[in-house]
Amino acid sequence: MKLLYIVPKLNNEGGVARVLSLKLNYFVEKFGYEIHVLTQNKGDFPLFYSFNEKIVFHDMILSGKAFYFFNAFRKSLKEKVEAIQPDAIVVCDNGLKAFAIPFILSGEIPIIFECHGSKFVEEKQLKSDLISKIKLSLKYRFKDFSANKFSKVVALSNESLSEWNVNNGLVIPNPCWIQNDISADLKSKKVITVARNSYEKGLDRLLLIWEKVIKKHSDWILEIYGDSITYLQPIVSDLGLGSNVSLNEPVKNISEKYLASSILVMTSRSEGFPMALLEALASGLPCVAYDCPTGPRAIIDNEVNGFLIEDGNVDSFVQKLESLIEDENLRLQMGKNAKESIKKYKIDGIMEQWEELFKGLNCLKV
C-alpha cells in the first residue's frame, strides 16, 4: 500500500506532527506501507519528532498572494500526485486550500480528510461587521460542501464529526504515545500547559486565570511549554506574574515535565483531539480544561479524571483548579482515574481501524 499524506508543516513540535510521527512510523514498521508526505516545510530540517528513514518527504515551495499562492499549490499538488501515484491520499490540513483538493484531484484515487481541528477554528479574533460575517458564513458552507467530496472524513471524536454536515464520516481517535506504568506523584507545586502561543490555544486566557489563582497560592508555579512563547513575557510582566510563571521553549523530553507536575490546564478556544491532554492523563495528571469545540469533552470525564469547564467561565475554572491545588487526595484520586482512562487510546487498536479503512477504500470505485 502506497499512501500520500498532505500536511502543511511537520517541522514543528505541535500535536499534529507528534501524532503523525506515531502513525506514519507504525504504517512503515508494522504494516510495511510505503509512505510519502507532501509538506510546506520549505526545506527546514531536521524534524522535531523522529520519523522512520523510509518515509519520503516532498516539499512544496509556495509564495505570493492568494491567487498566485493557490495556483502554485494546485500545480505542485498535481505534479507530485502524478509522480508518486499513491493508492490513497490523506489530507491533514485545516486550511481553506485543503478543501479544494477533491476538485483539483478529480481522479480515481481515494482522498481522505483527517480532521485535526474544529471546523470553526480561527487563527485570530473574528470581526463583527456584516461583511465579515457573510464571508465567514460562505467559508463554512464551502467547507461542508467540499467535505462531502472526500472519499471519507475521519474525525477524532463524535463531537468533532457532529460539526460536519457529511454522510461519509467516521471517528478514529488519536493514539497516545505514552504507555508506561510510571505516574507523577502529584506532590509538586507545579501546573503545566503545553501549547503553541496562538490565538486558538488561548494562553492569554490562562494567564488571567493564573493571576487570580496565585492570590491564594503564591507558592505554586505555572510552567508553559510551546513555540513563540517569549511573546507572552510582556503579559506576564504586566500582570505581575514573573515569580509564578515559567515560559519554556518546546522540549523533546516533555514526558519528564509531565511527571514533575501535579495538574495540566488547557484554555484553548478550539481544539481537535489535543495530544497534551492524552499525554498528561497517561502521566497520571488530573486535567482542567475549557469545554471548547472540540476535543476536551471527548477526553475528560468531568469530575472523574479532571474538570471540564464552561468555555470562558473564568470563575469556575479558578474554583476547580484551586480545589485540586488545595486537596491532594482529590488530585491523587483523579490522577489514578486519569491513568486508567488512557488505556482505550493504545496505538495497536487505533491503527487497526486505519488499516481497515484503507483496505475498504481500495475495494471501492471512487
What are these regions (language model features)?
Residues 6-13, 26-68, 163, 228-230:
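N-terminal strand-loop element at the rim of the active site
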Residues 14-22, 189, 196-212, 315:
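A conserved mid-protein helix/loop that constitutes part of the nucleotide-sugar donor-binding site
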Residues 91-97, 115:
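Short His-centered aromatic/hydrophobic patch
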Residues 132-153:
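Membrane-proximal helix-turn-helix segments that form the acceptor-binding/catalytic region
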Residues 250, 269:
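Aromatic "clamp/platform" in nucleotide-sugar-dependent glycosyltransferases that forms part
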Residues 286-290:
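Short hydrophobic beta-strand element within catalytic cores of glycosyltransferases
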Residues 301-303, 307-314, 322-329, 343:
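Conserved acidic donor-binding segment of nucleotide-sugar-dependent glycosyltransferases
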Residues 316, 323, 330-344, 353-356:
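A short, well-ordered alpha-helix in the C-terminal region of glycosyltransferases
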